[in-house]
Amino acid sequence: MKPLLAIAILILPAPMLFAQAGPRVSTLPFESVPSPLKYSIDQNLGEVLSVAVNSRGHIIVLNHPGTATAGPVYGNATTQIFEFDADGKYVRELGRGVYGLAYAHSVRFDKYDNLWVVDKAAMSVIKFDPAGYVLMNLGRRDEGPDEPHYRKADPPPTPVDGLFNGSTDVAWDKDDNIYVGDGYFNSRIAKFDKHGNWIKQWGGPGTGGVHANENPGHIRNPHNIGIDRDSNVYVADRGNRRIQVFDVDGNFKKFIFLNVPYDKMRHPVFGNLPVDRPDETAPWTICITNTTPQYLFTTDAEPGRLYKLQLPEGKILGTWGESGHELGELNWAHGIACPSEDLLYIADMNNWRVQKLVTKGKK
């Protein structure tokens, strides 16, 4: 099927109608602030996978340094969690020596300023209080296996209630129930109550077809998740190049596609120029603002853009950026924090930095 203007729209039964975007989208008026974080020379960042901001404006940076201890890097301690104040001044490091930290994938603050860290390799979700003490752990880290269990078996192992396999992200609904993106290999959403008790799961591995519009509810890596005030659960179904929207019980509501035209002949940062590049690109991140109305920000790896969507419709309002290495360019934007629609922090993974974006004229 050929796209209509900027966004592909398919006529489906009412619960499956696609969010629509206009025929053209504008460039978002963001500018990137040089050197937004202040730290010493011995704290150079490595791959930055995620960033979060609490109610005080303090910034948490999830860093993967080059100081892993003996053993396979992926299965050992290669995670640092740095805190900076609202002015970007270094405050402290959190989580040193915590058993469930190995190769952390995402950090999020809940509405109580508790910090949650989702670890892909340790297959754990860890809750820290504002002081930095561990309050809860979901999942369980393997006991130093000889063979790395994070590798996908063929066929993949059967998911187990309460355990994860390549966990990616966490979100909460208005009743404080916990939703975990699980993950690289289980490809499901796991739901717990606020005490950490298992409730249910939904999803499971499956493809979206050539145009990413088939098999609703099937997921290929729920890479990021978020929940709005209307209890819509947004899942960045990265492997299927789509955002899936569910209610809090896991009932599918609609797809949203990042189907804004781009230069398909522009060479990607990594790899050869693909022969058949799809119209829709793969969402990597999700951040929903605590504003009225709410907005959803997301990114893709190629062509390396940031997208702003209006909720709950999912209409794309604009894009910003492109892939590259310079300030204002992105090289695998792996996480977003969105304190407001005019202030964003982006975990610019392969550029080894955090970019701070502000709307021009609103510094």
Residue ranges and their predicted role:
Residues 20-363:
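Eukaryotic scaffold repeat domains enriched in small/polar residues
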Residues 1-4:
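Positively charged n-region of N-terminal signal peptides that target proteins for export
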Residues 6-16:
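Bacterial N-terminal signal peptides
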